[in-house]
Amino acid sequence: MLTPILATDDPYQAATVFVEAGWSLVFATPRDCGDPLTCVALAGARVMLGTSLPQFLPVQSRAHKGAGIEFHLTVPAADIDAIYQAHSQHADSVTGIAQQPWGERAFHAVLLGYRFLIAADQAEPPPDSGN
């Protein structure tokens, strides 16, 4: 399993943003421990939220945080609409949910400057397929 650690201004507030968008909180270190770190999950995919101190995110790089990277998450097909609705209400920006040219039903969301492509699991029949 690969778990990215994303630089944030406040990992605890960042976790709140993700949880409001439908993710679950896996853990949060104590605020006074000296190592601010949280972890959130969506459909089994985890993302850790760390600090943006200069040793993790140099000041000159802050304007480009998340540039050139998009995280692809596969979620259960039965959950994609609810996940889309939660992200529509709480993400920085969200595209419409649509059938992608490569066959996935998916949407793009930006949370705290990081891009996510959230797609329905193609191994599962769509909720309205009658299977």
Named regions from a protein language model:
Residues M1-I5, S24-V75, A82-V110, A120-N131:
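Vicinal oxygen chelate
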Residues A14-E20, H87, G113-Y114:
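Conserved active-site tyrosine of GNAT-family acetyltransferases
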Residues A15, I80-D81:
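Ser/Thr-Pro-rich, acidic low-complexity intrinsically disordered regions of eukaryotic RNA-binding
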Residues R115-A119:
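Short glycine-/small-residue motifs
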